[in-house]
Amino acid sequence: MLPTLDARLTAAAELVRPGQPVADIGCDHGKLTAVLAASGKYPKVIGADLRPGPLAKAKQTLENAGCLDRAELRLGDGLSVLSAGEVGSIVLAGVSAQTTWEIIEKAPWVSAVGGPRLIMVPATRHSELRRWLWQHGFALVADRPVQAAGRWYAVMAEEYTGKVTEPTFTQCLLGDTGRWPEGAGYAAWQRAKLPRMRLGVPDGSPLAAEMDAILKEGN
């Protein structure tokens, strides 16, 4: 039986480059790995996790879905399980923003023009991940807001171009989520955090002015 994906992983699956190998890093129970493998759209599907326990559960998920022969499971830390050029897309779902960029930093081959598409679903600190990616030469392909288990997530796809940009606070806060029907709900959720964030920003600073403008728009 094929596992059912929540809104986060469904959106992530839709952003994977078809016709190219894909890796699901931090695959946990292997639900996304199984769905990708069963689709037949990818010549190679790799599921990887740092811990043997989740990897064993991923194997069981693949067996139950009848696609164990169409996926490869690897035990290892982050992108160390991959070699440069091996996959066209890498999914990093369910880890923090900081963990995501630390994983990327440890694999310099990712930050190359023509490198893999990164599909990320940060569990926290969406704004900080957007800023880090843009400041390190990645360009936005998609930024989709989704709601799962009562929380908002941003499913981001980025590719390296080498063009470094310095985004505004507003760009980091909302990304390109406004083009989606769910964008208004995501924006309201992000804005709700601002009063607390604003407390630590000195009055009169450019950041304070930008935050105040966003708060005023929301009233």
Question: Where do the protein language model's features map onto the residues?
Answer:
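Class I S-adenosyl-L-methionine
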Residues: 2-7, 80-81, 86, 98-219
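Conserved class I S-adenosyl-L-methionine
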Residues: 19-28
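Conserved SAM-binding loop of SAM-dependent methyltransferases across substrates and taxa
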Residues: 29-41
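S-adenosyl-L-methionine
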Residues: 1-20, 34, 56-85
